[in-house]
C-alpha cells in the first residue's frame, strides 16, 4: 500500500522507496525519514511498519506491547499493523505476529497457505490460497466469524 492512515497520522510510501509521515508523533510513529528500500507500509494505532525490498521489516513508535519487535523477521511478503500488534506474511505462506495478545490476535503460528493478511484493532484475518478465510482475536461483534467464507479473492 502506498498510503496508510489511522488515528491522527498519515504515512506515505514514495516511488524511490523512502517514507514520509505527518500528524501526531506522540509515540515516534512518524520517525520514518531514514527508512530506505521500503516496498510496503502499514500504520497502526501508535506504530508504523515498513517492509523492505529484501524481505526484512522495520518499525517505529509505541513499543509498550512489543508491537515493533520485528527486527529479526526475514522472508516477509506483506505486513499489517493493528492497534497494538503487527502481523507479517512470509513467502512460504505462514504468518508471524508480535505485540499485544490479550485476545489471542497473535495466535497465527499454525496458519498455512496464507496469501493475504490484515490486522484489525484486536483481531487478525488471513486469506488462504483456496479462497477461505481464517481469523483470530476479539470477536464480540462477530468480526472473526469468517469460517464459512469461500471464494474470497
State the predicted function of each range.
Residues 9, 29, 47, 65-67, ...:
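Intrinsically disordered, low-complexity repeat/linker tracts enriched for polar/charged residues
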Residues 9-12, 21, 47-50, 59, ...:
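Conserved core positions of repeat-based scaffolds
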Residues 136-153:
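Blade-level signature of beta-propeller repeat domains, shared across WD40, Kelch, NHL, RCC1
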Residues 32-34, 70-72, 108-110, 146-147:
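Surface loop/turn motifs at the tips and blade-to-blade linkers of beta-strand repeat domains
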Residues 1-3, 13, 151-153:
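Low-complexity/repetitive intrinsically disordered segments
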Residues 25-26, 63-64, 101-102, 131-132, ...:
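Acidic glycine-/aspartate-rich tracts in secreted/extracellular proteins
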Residues 6-7, 37, 44-45, 75, ...:
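Beta-rich catalytic cores
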Residues 1-2, 15-18, 36-40, 53-58, ...:
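Tandem repeat domain/solenoid detector
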Amino acid at each position: 500500500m502506498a498510503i496508510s492512515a489511522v488515528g491522527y497520522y498519515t504515512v506515505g510510501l514514495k516511488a524511490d522507496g523512502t517514507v514520509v509521515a505527518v500528524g501526531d508523533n506522540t509515540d515516534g510513529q512518524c520517525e520514518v525519514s531514514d527508512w530506505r528500500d521500503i516496498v510496503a507500509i502499514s500504520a497502526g494505532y501508535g506504530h508504523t511498519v515498513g517492509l523492505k525490498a529484501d524481505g526484512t521489516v522495520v518499525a517505529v513508535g509505541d513499543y509498550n506491547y512489543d508491537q515493533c519487535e520485528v527486527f529479526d523477521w526475514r522472508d516477509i511478503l506483506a505486513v499489517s499493523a493493528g492497534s497494538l500488534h503487527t502481523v507479517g506474511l512470509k513467502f512460504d505462506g505462514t504468518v508471524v505476529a508480535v505485540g499485544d495478545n490479550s485476545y489471542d490476535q497473535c495466535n497465527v503460528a499454525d496458519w498455512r497457505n496464507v496469501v493475504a493478511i490484515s490486522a484489525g484493532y484486536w483481531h487478525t484475518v488471513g486469506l488462504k490460497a483456496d479462497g477461505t478465510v481464517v481469523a483470530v482475536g476479539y470477536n464480540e461483534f462477530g468480526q472473526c466469524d469468517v469460517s464459512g467464507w469461500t471464494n474470497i479473492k
